[in-house]
Amino acid sequence: MNENLFTSFITPTMMGLPIVILVIVFPAMLYPSPNRLINNRLISIQQWLVQLILKQMLLIHNSKGRTWALMLISLILFIGSTNLLGLVPYTFTPTTQLSMNLGMAIPLWAGAVITGFRHKAKASLAHFLPQGTPITLIPMLVVIETISLFIQPMALAIRLTANITAGHLLMHLIGGAVLALTSISPAAATITFIILLLLTILEFAVALIQAYVFTLLVSLYLHDNT
């Protein structure tokens, strides 16, 4: 029986319970205690990458905006690791679910907007009406800016969902083509398999890039409101 193309996007369960519970609990059991942590090259590289990412994201922030550094680095590590784990065979990618991405995007966006209205109410309201706008265009621009503000979290979530889903579907289709061509034309199957390997490497890059883009946009929303 042929497998449904979207089967990989269905939350896997075991005995009626979501397997994601095991995914969350099992790594926590293996997490090393502070006395087991050691300084080695891998940890040094990880610290260097974290510092580099934070430096790039916090360049535009003032001292108040830099208090969000821990949240931003936690967000990019969570999304990046989730995207990479989704590339492992027989696993599930939570970021292909629009509901999860909206669950991340809406609270982060709402927190940034509420922070802006609490600390910079006049500046936040000024975004709805650019300076020098003709009087006749004021009502229309206010409506347009309001709509664009509320579209931001949806665009943030849909961008991540679409990019991750498209890559997984393409890998699924090419992988099926490799299996179908194996018995028909080994040469064509070999070429298609090479394309699949290149696409897999590209998906690793996309997984990290999309995590960076998502977090960078959240950082920009915070910058506009702090």
From Swiss-Prot:
Similarity comment: family membership: Belongs to the ATPase A chain family.
Catalytic activity: H(+)(in) = H(+)(out)
Organism: Dugong dugon (Dugong)
GO biological process, one term: proton motive force-driven ATP synthesis
One GO location term (cellular component): proton-transporting ATP synthase complex
Membrane topology classification: Multi-pass membrane protein
Subunit: Component of the ATP synthase complex composed at least of ATP5F1A/subunit alpha, ATP5F1B/subunit beta, ATP5MC1/subunit c (homooctomer), MT-ATP6/subunit a, MT-ATP8/subunit 8, ATP5ME/subunit e, ATP5MF/subunit f, ATP5MG/subunit g, ATP5MK/subunit k, ATP5MJ/subunit j, ATP5F1C/subunit gamma, ATP5F1D/subunit delta, ATP5F1E/subunit epsilon, ATP5PF/subunit F6, ATP5PB/subunit b, ATP5PD/subunit d, ATP5PO/subunit OSCP.
Keywords: ATP synthesis, CF(0), Hydrogen ion transport, Ion transport, Membrane, Mitochondrion, Mitochondrion inner membrane, Transmembrane, Transmembrane helix, Transport
Ranges that cross the membrane: 9-29, 68-88, 97-117, 138-158, 164-184, 201-223
Main location: mitochondrion
Protein name per its UniProtKB record: ATP synthase F(0) complex subunit a
The protein's role, per its UniProt record: Subunit a, of the mitochondrial membrane ATP synthase complex (F(1)F(0) ATP synthase or Complex V) that produces ATP from ADP in the presence of a proton gradient across the membrane which is generated by electron transport complexes of the respiratory chain. ATP synthase complex consist of a soluble F(1) head domain - the catalytic core - and a membrane F(1) domain - the membrane proton channel. These two domains are linked by a central stalk rotating inside the F(1) region and a stationary peripheral stalk.
InterPro entries per record: ATP_synth_F0_asu, ATP_synth_F0_asu_AS, ATP_synth_F0_asu_bact/mt, F0_ATP_A_sf
Subcellular location(s) of the protein: Mitochondrion inner membrane
Pfam families given in the database record: ATP-synt_A
PANTHER family: ATP SYNTHASE SUBUNIT A
PROSITE patterns: ATPASE_A
GO MF annotation list: proton channel activity; proton-transporting ATP synthase activity, rotational mechanism
